[in-house]
Amino acid sequence: MQNKPSSYDREDLLASSRGELFGPNGPQLPAPNMLMMDRIPLMSETEGLFGKGKVIAELDITPDLWFFDCHFPGDPVMPGCLGLDAMWQLVGFFLGWVGGQGKGRALGVGEVKFTGQVLPTAKKVTYEIDFKRVINRKLVMGLADGRVLVDGKEIYVAKDLKVGLFQDTSAF
């Protein structure tokens, strides 16, 4: 992909979920409701803590988001696993952005720590992904550290997020 955009809006992310952004064999983001971001203001192959790439994405929080009604009635909080999934989504998106082909699959995470929560009173969740390694050969895989912030305060940290792109997922 030549002259790659360094940012994406909601319509771009929805195009990715339909398989229209990175070609017919490229990775896709999930569709709503599992699409856990509204925009990506930064994509870089050279920035980040390790100098191997950085992604920043944002999710606007409103009290009517679907997960607040069911998790938990009377005690609404965004499930932590959705923030973790968003970080995996962004690692896969980055792999497509750098030209990787295949279907994205989360392969694991080394460590996750939750030190806060996303409540309906929050305004914005920010995801920051710093790439440690990107392999784009026969094997396509990204390894990154990530963090989730709510209204500027760090609440989750994930070390060694791992996502691969696969031509054939039938053996999974």
UniProtKB/Swiss-Prot annotation:
The residues responsible for catalysis, as annotated, are H71
Q: Which reaction does it catalyse?
A: a (3R)-hydroxyacyl-[ACP] = a (2E)-enoyl-[ACP] + H2O; (3R)-hydroxydecanoyl-[ACP] = (2E)-decenoyl-[ACP] + H2O; (2E)-decenoyl-[ACP] = (3Z)-decenoyl-[ACP]
Q: Which Pfam families match?
A: FabA (PF07977)
Primary location: cytoplasm
Q: Where found, per UniProt? A: Cytoplasm
An example Gene Ontology biological process: unsaturated fatty acid biosynthetic process
Please provide, alphabetically and separated by semicolons, the GO molecular function terms listed in this UniProt record: (3R)-hydroxyacyl-[acyl-carrier-protein] dehydratase activity; trans-2-decenoyl-acyl-carrier-protein isomerase activity
**Pathway info:** Lipid metabolism; fatty acid biosynthesis
So which domain of life are we looking at? Bacteria
Record's family? Belongs to the thioester dehydratase family. FabA subfamily.
Q: How does it assemble?
A: Homodimer.
**Which purpose does this protein serve, as stated in its record?**
Necessary for the introduction of cis unsaturation into fatty acids. Catalyzes the dehydration of (3R)-3-hydroxydecanoyl-ACP to E-(2)-decenoyl-ACP and then its isomerization to Z-(3)-decenoyl-ACP. Can catalyze the dehydratase reaction for beta-hydroxyacyl-ACPs with saturated chain lengths up to 16:0, being most active on intermediate chain length.
Would you tell me the protein name for this molecule? 3-hydroxydecanoyl-[acyl-carrier-protein] dehydratase
